[in-house]
Amino acid sequence: MYVPEEIIETVRMIEYQHLDIRTTTLGVNLKDCADKDLDLLKENIYDKITSLGGNLVETAEKVSQKYGIPIVNKRISVTPIGLIIGSTLKGLNEEESVDACVEVGITLDKIAKDVGVDFIGGYSALVHKRATPEEKMLIRSIPKLMTKTDKVCASVNVATTKSGINMYAVKKMGEIIKETSECTKDAIGCAKIVVFCNAPEDNPFMAGAFHGPGEGDAVINAGVSGPGVVRAVVEKLKGKDIGTISEEIKKTAFKITRMGELVGREVANELNVDFGIVDLSLAPTPAPGDSIANILEAMGLERCGTHGTTAALALLNDAVKKGGAMASSYVGGLSGAFIPVSEDAGMIEAVEVGALNLSKLEAMTCVCSVGLDMIAIPGKTPASTVSAIIADEMAIGMINKKTTAVRLIPVPGKDVGEYVEYGGLLGTAPIMEVFEFSSEEFINRGGRIPAPIQSLTN
């Protein structure tokens, strides 16, 4: 039985504190779509996704209205294209292979537009040990894909705790990100490319979502959001000790996750597909008050990025996980606190006043998900430096047995102190400083960083 206070609290969360379901993502298996003929492959992909997801947007809107809970994004993730395109590329030269990969990406883009979803993810390759010939072609095709599509997201897993770090792939992804930045307006294509260590197979969030090879035929994964709610709770706890803050965040995360599970299961039931997981991640937006940085500042930091920030973030991340895990039997995805610079008004302010830099963000990624996210850097940054930043972040994930990722945006013609404006959820990104000392010789060595001793768990 709900008491009036709880009902009013929920209304307040939604109306004033930006509580919403950030995404309901339909994961679709495409392994049965593989074909030697490119046209048949595209037809199979189109038919399967539209038959399963044709009503996704309409269903999510109906569930949203039923419960009065906003569902901000409706998305689709698919089996990594690198796993299904091999037979199609047999006998083709490199240029033809790249073009064939791009054609599949264009088909995904058409599906996203026809179905009405915000993004479609899964233009992906899993190359944490080595890349197959078709995966190399897929990776090579990413910049061209980004010039020809609007809604397709690409991701590449270059490292795992069990396999180590594929430094050939790290080097290549630095080059791909640089090339993409130069051929898309304001480097917007880079906002749709993620490089992973320990990529989860059931992530509902873009740009890194794909439907993992261990997943079933179709599944709904839900991602919740609620930084504004958590901030409001923490602001009421002035003078209270850290344990009290942790306890109250846990209680709040429980309520948020319960809501996510309710909505996710309802959408899955309506679409007649399995319910997968709830991703517990606190995902900020550029809206005032909907900020991870503001939560940390409410704990007593003058500015996010000052000394104590990593400890405060660790507290937040752990409390959210504990509260969320109690609320749902099936927790997955990234499940932590996101710290994307361009999508968080508090982070942007911290960069502007000099409290937050790239090195501090890297330290913060040791205790939260997911990594160096939506960070704009000078357009003159060489590809080897982009690769080196990726390598550092992959090492953090590999050693700590956690997911880490990099979404860097080298913006042509922009330098430190300037901004790039994307609008909407992607927000505004201040150009952040990177070291000018070279990492080129290290990156050019290639090879594979061996898996750490922590990987020997059997």
UniProtKB/Swiss-Prot annotation:
Highest taxon above the source species: Archaea
CDD domains (alphabetical): RNR_PFL_like_DUF711
Pfam family, one: DUF711
InterPro entries: UPF0210
Family designation: Belongs to the UPF0210 family.
Family annotation (NCBIfam families): PRK05313.1
Protein known as: UPF0210 protein Mevan_0738
Lineage: Archaea, Methanobacteriati, Methanobacteriota, Methanomada group, Methanococci
